[in-house]
Amino acid sequence: MKNELKKARTQKHKKIIASIPYTLLFAYMAIFVLGCETSQTSSGNLDTTNITPTQSQALQIIQNALVDEDSLARVNAVEVIVTTGQIKFMPQVQRLLRDKFTPVRFAAALAIGDLRYSPAKSSLSQSLKDEDINVIVAAAYAMGRLGSTKYFEIVRKAIDNDDQTVRANAAFILGRMEDRNSLKLLKWAQEDKDSSDKVRLQALEARARLGDDEVLPRLWAIVYSAYADDRIMGIRAIGALATSKARDILITKLDDDILEVRLAAAEQLGKLGNRTGEMEVLEAVEKNLTTGLDREASERANVLAALAIGEICTPELTKFLPNLLKNESKFVRIAAAKAVLQCKMK
């Protein structure tokens, strides 16, 4: 009976791996990304003359990922650069505006906007003519962040695009523009009968990011979905809301049956400055709870554990990062590198 229950749980959460890495957005679709977080540029750019061997290894992992043959690894690397404010890598990110893969170009444009990397402004003007509208929307966002605010209108208009990926990406970007006037557009996208589920969920998360408390009941329902992948996506959106009620809901998910859900909740709590999930993460890495999982599930859990460590950053957890930096999976290594750089910033 116990083995059957374990098997059932594995089957029920098996589609998580498909929904997180190849999810709603054209970019930031890494296993650990559903939209990258606001960077802390002022403190994130490490002084390479005074770093530990572990930090040096983390930087090398990101450097390698930027030129990895796997486009998803390149997207992951860009997300880490933004989140940790590694400006020194931005010339390489700028070159990715010419990458042959659309998600990479999209991620590069977003990164330039997020970090307000003005040396890339002339390159962005070319991205505004990209063959893919998703890249054009991302470039418009970046141009707006660099002072040419008229381009934000391109993002606003994209929310009404018939292409559901374009619409979802527009919702994602609207949530990053820090303009509460976008709430009306996001609510429309969420409620429009032609919007797909991915658009509705992205609109909900964007509304949460903009501090719209009205989304809480809807997100609550998603967090308690029967499907683990839905719960994880709901947890990310709840974390973006960043209220005391959101925190309380996240704490309840530390008791979830599925390891990945518990780790995702611990990560979001860490972002809110709450270390309640530390023991869940510690148990996962100390007791090696990924043992017995298939390779895909193990990779997923290790990525989520590394991300949670990067938000909580206690010595009891960070001591596991050196081993995670040596994991056979490049995605686990990138997530661990992100955690190392994040903890250096705190």
Where are the language model's segments positioned?
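Bacterial lipoprotein signal-peptidase II cleavage site
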Residues: 37-44
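Short inter-helical turns and helix N-cap capping residues of alpha-solenoid HEAT/ARM repeat scaffolds
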Residues: 69-70, 100-101, 131-132, 162-163, ...
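C-terminal motif of bacterial Sec signal peptides marking the signal peptidase cleavage site
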Residues: 33-35
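Amphipathic alpha-helical scaffolding segments comprising HEAT/armadillo-like alpha-solenoid repeats
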Residues: 38, 52-65, 86-98, 117-129, ...
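Bacterial N-terminal signal peptides that target proteins for export
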Residues: 4-24
